[in-house]
């Protein structure tokens, strides 16, 4: 039933509500699992969401569902049904996991390790249910070797080119803290009172790790780190051919039910007709209405009313600044409130930072009319003339209590106004919302997380000054800045490192480092900031102490990382080296595959060999699982590097296990795939079986499978299952051939 309603598609970090996911007919894993848990609970089946904060062997994370059946928890892939429980495409990745979390209502006294406790819920570690584990103990001492009590200890996994904190503990009176995790490597970071120390912990190998707080935020140096993830050891329940056939039949039926609903969404032709009838910009209107999916009626009603009120241009501007996900679930009340209570747009800055209802990842609400009514005219004018007065008002009137909002869900701006109590994040969103309601451009900087506003200069927004908001400071200031330049000596397979894929920057605050969130481009596709457009010619950063992390992910999942610490000084340029470490191993023959193996090319009735299709030389062969998340990731990764594969020029043969599987494949979901691809059917699963046997894969059913081989029947690369960055891994090997 859940698969009838929702399938997987990547999206931004805000989690849609269960009913919003139904309306859209798709969602990312966190939304699929939230929806499925809600559905199971609604019919009396105990259920919970389980997630890994970050994978260790590949970038990204994942969430799924556990249901309570006959006195035991069983897992499954949310809206991705398998014939039996305890089976999903993620069995193999989960066996390589470091941590798995879930939440339990209230206090908890069970056997699982407690990760985090609040008055409302307890977060527990359920990694023992999925992978072999070991306990790692950490002793934190000062420079004299004395144990340090109440030091903060962060356990970090390398993922998306940063060391991401997956667990935070505090040392006891003897200076100890511990964690149970999968048998791989983490970076452990300890800090207290401005001093810090760190070291690599290999779970299952290191019984106790000693960390000395002997570092401070002034030292400049660089060091390499080799990070090894847990080994794979998937335990897969048996599925009979009859069960698989019946499951495939049901999934096809469920697809047809969902697709019948999706067919009711507005079409491009209907959207174009609507735009013409209302004299709207055709290109933008069509794009916005198609993107709204099941919410298209809300947008057409809103635009129709805006045309009648002679506000069509501003209405389009409003829809352009909200997120793609907002288009799919925004309410008429929100759109009308912000259209009718924001003044007239004067610039791009106005649209983004006054008209825009969204501040961070909160549920957007209709707050502008409320604030215009509640704030006395004299105060409103004083705030506009001097936004510092609004900062002071917030400091005086809003009490901060981070303990009361234990679920960390942002309060609405109106809720903060009425309660006069909020957590820090909700207070920050409230300040920006209130400022925008008064016509003051304000925002939370996406890179640094700083709250900022722009002053008026003779009513000219463009010439106003940008100030940082510090609720602890007596006066708001413009932060002093310096410039960071990074030198990079290209390695053969990488001319322009990407942010999140190959490197990140973090700023030192309160004893630890906080990531700078530069643009990542399309979700799940990398893109965005790179070395050449960010650091080659220099970028301005606030003064302070920083860390650059770089990493080369190997096909095994291991990482060759490098960490560089440096300081940015006011008005000065700091130059560092961006080091991408390389494996010293040359491309090696790791197995065999018969290039005379045959498959059935799509659109033909005669089998053809791989050799006939590809000619002499190297080629890529893959067996795909249509509609499955790991295959979708792989195809998006390949599309992202389409130009590289075109330049290589060799054939890629992408096969499906059956004609039925091929019919489920929608190439339009993966724009930009290279023209060198040939699609076909792996008749009777012969090629899939051969790859699994010759490469000694632990399970022959996990898809996708990719190999790079040649017509001498040698294999130099193999990948199976869920891998982020597959396209890049393929190109690394190709560059080494």
Language model features: what each stretch is:
Residues 1-24, 243-245, 254-419, 429:
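Secondary-structure boundary elements
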Residues 134-145, 175, 482-495, 589:
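A short, amphipathic beta-strand motif
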Residues 1, 9-19, 24-116, 187-189, ...:
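Hydrophobic/aromatic-rich core segments of domains that either
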């Amino acid at each position: 039933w859940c698969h009838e309603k929702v399938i997987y598609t990547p999206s931004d970090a805000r989690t849609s509500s269960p009913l919003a996911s139904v309306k859209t007919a798709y969602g990312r894993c966190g939304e699929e699992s939230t929806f499925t848990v809600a559905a199971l609970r609604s019919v009396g089946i105990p259920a919970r969401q389980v997630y890994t904060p970050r994978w260790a062997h590949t970038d990204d994370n994942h969430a799924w569902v556990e249901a309570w059946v006959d006195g035991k928890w069983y897992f499954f892939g949310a809206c991705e049904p398998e014939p039996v429980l305890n089976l999903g495409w993620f069995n193999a990745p989960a066996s390589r996991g470091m941590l798995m979390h879930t939440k339990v209502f209230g206090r908890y006294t069970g056997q699982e390790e407690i990760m985090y406790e609040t008055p409302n819920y307890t977060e527990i570690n359920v990694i023992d249910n999925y992978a072999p584990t070991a306990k790692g103990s950490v002793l934190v001492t000062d420079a004299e070797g004395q144990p340090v009590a109440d030091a903060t200890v962060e356990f970090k996994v390398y993922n998306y080119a940063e060391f991401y904190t997956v667990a935070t503990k505090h040392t006891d009176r003897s200076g100890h803290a511990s964690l149970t995790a999968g048998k791989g490597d983490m970076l452990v970071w300890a800090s207290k009172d401005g001093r810090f120390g760190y070291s690599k912990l290999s779970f299952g190998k290191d019984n106790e790790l000693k960390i000395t707080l002997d570092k401070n935020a002034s030292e400049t140096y660089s060091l390499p780190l080799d990070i090894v993830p847990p080994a794979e050891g998937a335990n897969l329940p048996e599925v009979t051919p009859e069960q698989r056939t019946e499951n495939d039949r049901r999934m096809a039926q469920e697809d047809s039910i969902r697709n019948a609903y999706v067919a009711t969404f507005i079409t491009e032709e209907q959207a174009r007709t609507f735009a013409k009838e209302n004299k709207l910009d055709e290109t933008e209107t069509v794009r916005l209405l198609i993107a709204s999916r099941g919410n298209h009626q809300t947008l057409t009603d809103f635009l129709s009313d805006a045309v009648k009120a002679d506000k069509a241009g501003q209405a389009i501007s409003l829809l352009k600044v909200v997120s793609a996900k907002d288009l799919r679930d925004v309410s008429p009340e929100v759109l009308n409130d912000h259209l009718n209570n924001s003044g007239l747009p004067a610039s791009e800055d106005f649209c983004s930072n006054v008209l825009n209802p969204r501040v961070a990842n909160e549920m957007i609400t209709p707050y502008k009319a409320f604030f215009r009514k509640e704030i006395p005219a004299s105060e409103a004018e004083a705030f506009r003339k001097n936004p510092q007065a609004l900062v002071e008002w917030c400091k005086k009137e809003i009490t901060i209590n981070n303990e009361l909002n234990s679920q960390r869900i942002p309060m609405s701006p109106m809720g903060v106004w009425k309660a006069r109590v909020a957590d820090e994040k909700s207070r920050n969103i409230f300040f920006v919302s209130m400022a925008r309601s008064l016509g003051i451009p304000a925002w939370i900087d996406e890179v640094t997380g700083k709250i900022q506003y722009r002053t008026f200069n003779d009513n000219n927004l463009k010439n106003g000054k940008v100030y940082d908001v510090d609720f602890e400071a007596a006066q708001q200031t413009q932060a002093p800045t310096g410039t960071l330049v990074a030198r990079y000596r290209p390695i053969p397979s990488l001319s322009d490192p990407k942010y999140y894929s190959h490197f990140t920057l973090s700023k030192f605050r309160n004893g630890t480092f906080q990531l700078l969130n530069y643009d990542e481009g399309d979700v799940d596709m990398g893109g965005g900031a790179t070395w050449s457009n960010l650091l080659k010619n220099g970028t301005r950063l606030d003064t302070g102490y920083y860390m650059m992390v770089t990493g080369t992910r190997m096909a095994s999942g291991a990482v060759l990382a490098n960490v560089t610490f440096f300081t940015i000084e006011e008005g000065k340029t700091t130059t560092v080296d961006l080091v991408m470490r390389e494996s010293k191993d040359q491309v090696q023959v790791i197995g065999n595959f018969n290039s005379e193996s045959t498959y059935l090319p799509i659109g033909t009735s005669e089998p053809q060999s791989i050799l006939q299709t590809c000619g002499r030389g190297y080629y890529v062969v893959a067996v795909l699982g249509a509609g499955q998340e790991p295959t979708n990731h792989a195809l998006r990764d390949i599309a992202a590097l389409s130009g590289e594969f075109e330049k290589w020029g060799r054939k890629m043969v992408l096969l499906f296990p059956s004609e039925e599987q091929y019919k489920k494949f929608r190439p339009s979901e993966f724009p930009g795939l290279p023209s060198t691809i040939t699609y076909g059917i792996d008749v009777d699963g012969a090629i899939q079986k051969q790859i699994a046997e010759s490469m000694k894969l632990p399970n022959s059913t996990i898809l996708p499978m990719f190999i790079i081989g040649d017509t001498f029947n040698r294999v130099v690369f193999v990948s199976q299952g869920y891998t982020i960055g597959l396209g890049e891994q393929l190109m690394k090997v190709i560059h080494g051939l």
